[in-house]
């Protein structure tokens, strides 16, 4: 990984330091706030670098041990980045919407995944040739709908070892489920959120695409290193 100064410079250029309006702040973020500028809280990038490196080391360790980290980012600024990075390191992801019970009711979700996979297989191998075109179309549409929501976790055979969340406020249901099951949590935390809600908080702008991209890419590189070892 690059030295701290160049990493800090990259974070600065990506606008990682821009927090929310002061009036929206969560006082628990105080240790991570450097200043206030024109009514907006500015995040201390020294702290961001520190937290990012700690998170990267922990994620690398999980990946090295062969366990899975579930990437969660359903807001529009995060979707594409999360999808692309998770695929790059063969990690599961949720980018459309979080289905309640995705973790706490994992067995039921697995059944839906299996149903989706069997429809897919049967559509491909001619099993449905005897049904009408309309019925086949309906099945195909059902499969596509399921694929959209469940596609990213199709290969996840068991509950993941950890969750990596972009915007812990937006993904509060996913976070609550992980906490209930004692799953490790990593999260990008902006100035309007409570950093104590995750095991590893990365203080950063969670609204700008560039900011999300630099952090997710950095952590994905750490996971890739862990997988290679």
Task: Name what the model sees in each region.
Residues 15, 71, 163, 215:
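Residue-level signature of catalytic and energy-coupling elements of molecular machines
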Residues 174-176, 181-228:
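Short glycine/threonine-rich loop/turn motifs
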């Amino acid at each position: 990984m690059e030295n701290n100064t160049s990493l800090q410079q990259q974070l600065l250029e990506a606008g990682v330091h821009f927090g929310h309006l002061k009036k929206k702040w969560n006082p628990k973020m105080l240790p991570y706030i450097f200043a206030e500028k024109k009514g907006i809280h500015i995040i201390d990038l020294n702290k961001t670098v520190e937290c990012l490196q700690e998170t990267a080391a922990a994620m690398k360790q999980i990946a090295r041990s062969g366990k899975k980290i579930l990437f969660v980012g359903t807001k529009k600024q995060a979707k594409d980045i999360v999808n692309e990075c998770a695929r790059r390191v063969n990690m599961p992801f949720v980018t459309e919407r979080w289905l309640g019970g995705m973790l706490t009711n994992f067995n039921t979700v697995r059944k839906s995944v299996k149903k989706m996979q069997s429809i897919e297989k049967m559509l491909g191998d001619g099993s449905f040739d005897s049904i009408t075109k309309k019925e086949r179309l309906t099945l195909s549409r059902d499969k596509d709908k399921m694929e959209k929501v469940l596609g990213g976790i199709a290969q996840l055979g068991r509950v993941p070892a950890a969750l990596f969340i972009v915007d812990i406020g937006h993904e509060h249901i996913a976070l609550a489920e992980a906490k209930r099951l004692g799953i490790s949590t990593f999260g990008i935390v902006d100035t309007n959120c409570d950093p104590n809600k995750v095991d590893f908080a990365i203080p950063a702008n969670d609204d700008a695409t560039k900011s999300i991209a630099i952090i997710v890419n950095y952590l994905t590189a750490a996971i890739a290193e862990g997988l290679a070892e």
